[in-house]
A protein has these predicted regions:
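Short acidic/polar alpha-helix capping motifs at helix-coil junctions
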Residues: 2-5, 35-38, 70-73
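N-terminal beta1-alpha1 ligand-phosphate binding loop
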Residues: 3-25
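Residue-level recognition of beta-strand->loop/alpha-helix junctions
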Residues: 8, 35-36, 88, 121
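Short, surface-exposed acidic/glycine-rich loop or hinge patches that mediate macromolecular interfaces
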Residues: 9-12, 39, 57
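FMN-binding flavodoxin-like domain, especially the glycine-rich phosphate-binding loop
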Residues: 17, 25, 29, 47-174
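A short beta-strand-loop structural module common to alpha/beta enzyme folds
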Residues: 29-41
Length: 174
């Protein structure tokens, strides 16, 4: 399998912790933590055929600083033939009306650039009203709620890593 580029915003330690856990759970796959998103350039995204991108959702459904500044640039890239798996952190109890909306914003940007999204997961087990991250009844990636469901995080990451390894290798979307 080709090297995977891992991109995430370091604005919150939780996102960094989840990125580290994902890298560990992908054992045997070469993952290069590119640079923190605040130091990423367009050519960093174009250098990888397989990418994992992550961000938390802030306030009323916004991306953290740096990701929000990078989205217009992402949308203008040519990422046809590239696969992107997204992970996002959110709080379903306190923000049920925009739960992990940041993932949806990233998904829109990468799709506009021509990338194929992989790593879709079930919405079962979450209690929320609305989310921009839901596509066809599934989340457009791995959803982590460390505030309310931390006990489920390790299994969710392990299951998702197994799934995206297969999808990156085969091109199959769940």
């Amino acid at each position: 399998m080709k090297t995977i580029g891992l991109f995430y915003a370091m604005n919150a330690a939780k996102t960094s912790h989840i990125a580290d856990k994902i890298r560990e759970d992908l054992g045997g796959v070469k993952v290069r933590e590119v640079v923190l998103i605040e130091r990423a350039w367009q050519n960093d995204f174009q250098a990888y055929d397989n990418m994992i991108v992550g961000a938390s959702t802030w306030f009323d459904g916004e991306l953290p600083t740096y990701w929000d500044e990078l989205v217009p640039e992402l949308e203008s890239l040519d990422l046809k033939g590239k696969k992107v798996a997204i992970f996002g952190l959110g709080d379903q109890k306190n923000y049920p009306d925009n739960f992990v909306d940041g993932m949806g914003i990233l998904a829109d940007a990468f799709q506009k650039a021509g990338a194929e999204l992989v790593g879709f997961t079930s919405t079962d087990g979450y209690a929320f009203s609305q989310s921009r991250a839901v596509r066809g009844g599934k989340f457009c990636g791995l959803v982590i709620d460390q505030e309310n469901q931390a006990q489920l995080t390790s299994k969710r990451i392990a299951d998702w890593c197994k799934q995206i390894k297969e999808e990156f290798a085969s091109g199959k979307k769940e």
